Amino acid sequence: MDGSVASSSVWDTQKVYKHHEQQNVAQTRPKYREGRRLKAVKVYTINLESRYLLVQGVPAIGVMAELVQLFALYGVIEEYRPLDEYPAEQFTEVYLIQFQKLTSARAAKRHTDEKSFFGGQLHVCYAPEYETVEETKQKLQDRRRYVNWASQNAAKLHSQQAEVNTESSSSTDTRTAEAPIMQKNPEEARRENVNSDYMGFPLLPLPPTADISYRLQNHFTQPSQLQWTKETTEDKMGSLHNFIPPVQKTSTQSESSSSSGVKEGDLRQKQKISTPSIRFMPRTTHLESRKRKLDEQTFFLKEADKTGVLIGPKLPELPKLDMEDSSLNVTANLIRNTMTKAASVPEAKPVQAKHTTPKPRRRI
C-alpha cells in the first residue's frame, strides 16, 4: 500500500493504478475454457480483493441514483461518491462504492463488470488502495478464519467417509466368514437345480409345443420305449406363462447300485406328477368350456333346490278369511289367485317406437 495514501484521507487519492486498467482478451486461452463472453483470465487473492469498488464508464447524464440502486441489489452499501478529479473518458463519470461485506463486493463486481448501463459499458474493479490499515487487518483475519473453518470441515468429511468405508468392508468380511462352505456332489447339485431359478433370475417361458412329449429312459432308447403323455398345464385364463418344462436326466443304472436306481425312479415319478407336458388351448375354446361348466353347476344347484328336503321352521301362511258362505269363499279365492298371478308377472316395458328418417326424395 502506498504511504501517501495511508497518511491522507481515504477519498483523496486520484492516481490511476495498473489494476484499474481493463486488460485485453487473452488469446492463449485453451479451447475448453472458451465461452460466449471473451474475458481476460484474472485470479484475485485476498490482497487484491476489497470492499471498495471503482466504477468507470458511467454516462454523465445524472444517473447516480440508478447506479446505486443497481449495486444495492448485491449487498448493503456503506458509502458512495463520484470521483470528479479521476481521469475518465469524455462524457463519462467515475464512482467509488464501499460495501459492508467483502462477499457483497465480490458478487457485485462479477455481475456488473462489462454490463450495459444507459448506453455505456461499465468497468468495475477493486480499489484496495482506499482501505485503511485496520480494514486491511480485519480483512486478512476474516480470510484466515474462513480458511481454518473450511479445512476443518474437509478433514471431518474425510474422516467420516473413511469410517463408513471401514464399516462397510468389515461387514462384508463378517458376512463372508459366517457363510458356510458346502461341498456337494456335482450330480446331486445338478439334480436339485432341475426346477430352480438360476442366479436368482426366473427362467424364460418356452414356446408351446405339441401335445406329445418324448421321455428317454436310458442313453440307448428304442422306439418301443417311448412314452406318450397328454396332460393339461394351462391356468384358469388359458395361459402358459408360468409353466416350466421338466428336465429329464438320463442315467445308466448299474446292477450294484439298485438303491440309487429306486430313488431316481421315485424322483422321476414326482417330476411327472408335478410338471406335466404342454397343451395349447385357444382362449375362445377355454371360455366356452368354462361357461358350459358354470351352466352345469347352476343347473344342478337348481335341481337340488327343487328336490331337496327343507329343514327348519316354515314361514307362516297367509290367513284365509272364512266368508261363511261357499259362493263367497270361491269368489275370494278366485280374486286372491288372480292377484298373486298379477304380482308374479313381470312388468312389460313399453316398446319404444323406432324413429325412421324419411327417404330422400328422388330427383327426376
Swiss-Prot record:
Annotated GO biological process: mRNA processing; RNA splicing
Signal peptide from the UniProt entry: none
Domain of life: Eukaryota
One MF annotation (Gene Ontology) recorded for this entry: RNA binding
Keyword flag Electron transport: no
One Gene Ontology term, aspect cellular component: nucleoplasm
RRM domain segment(s): 51-129
Spans through the membrane: none
Keyword match Metal-binding: no
Binding partners and assembly: Component of the minor spliceosome, which splices U12-type introns.
Family: Belongs to the RBM48 family.
Protein name: RNA-binding protein 48
Gene behind the chain: rbm48
